[in-house]
Each structure stands twice: as structure tokens, then as C-alpha cells.
């Protein structure tokens, strides 16, 4: 009888809160690079999800110098700090972040159009 008791499966609740030590699916932190259409041919590239210990102003300064565009760091209530760049800079930003060693290529998600 003791063997049967140890083999009885327990109930699994998929909607229960995951424990901190359980790193299940969906816990991977991605860097999201999006493009938003403004008026006419103008567009805006946003970078969200970088680690908080990075200096966003220094990253922005390097991005602006590298791509010859203007940009700013915006504080959003839900998303935290977001880097905004003028123009469609999705590919440029992703290659820059990988080459600088800030983000792995697998951790970048590019959105838009």
C-alpha cells in the first residue's frame, strides 16, 4: 500500500502564482525594439526592456552619435525608462546592442510594420 500512496499524482494549478525559484516559460526578459509611424514619412523607434543598472543617457548618447539622429529618454509609468530615437533605427539599434555586449541576440524582439 505504501507504494501506491507515493505514486498518486498531485493536482496542478496552471493559474497559481509561480514561485521565485521556478523559472517557467514566459519569465525571460526581452528587449523590445518598436517603430511607430508619426505624421507622413516620419517614424519613431523605441527601445524598452534594458537592464535598470545601465545608464540610459550614456546609451542614448552613443546611439545618437552612431546613427546621426535625435533622441530622448522617456519615463513611462508602466514600461519604465524608454529610449526614443527619430527615424526607423530598428536594425541599427539591434546590431549596436549586440556588438556593445549589452544584450544577447536571442533576447531582442523587433516589432513594427
UniProtKB/Swiss-Prot annotation:
Region spans: Disordered: 1-24
Keywords: Acetylation, Protein biosynthesis, Translation regulation
Domain of life: Eukaryota
MF terms (GO), sorted A to Z: translation initiation factor activity
Gene3D superfamilies: SUI1-like domain
Keyword Protein biosynthesis: yes
BP GO terms, sorted: regulation of translation
Primary role: Probably involved in translation.
Name of the protein: Protein translation factor SUI1 homolog
Residues where N-acetylserine is found: 2
Keyword Protein biosynthesis appears in the UniProt entry: yes
Family from the record: Belongs to the SUI1 family.
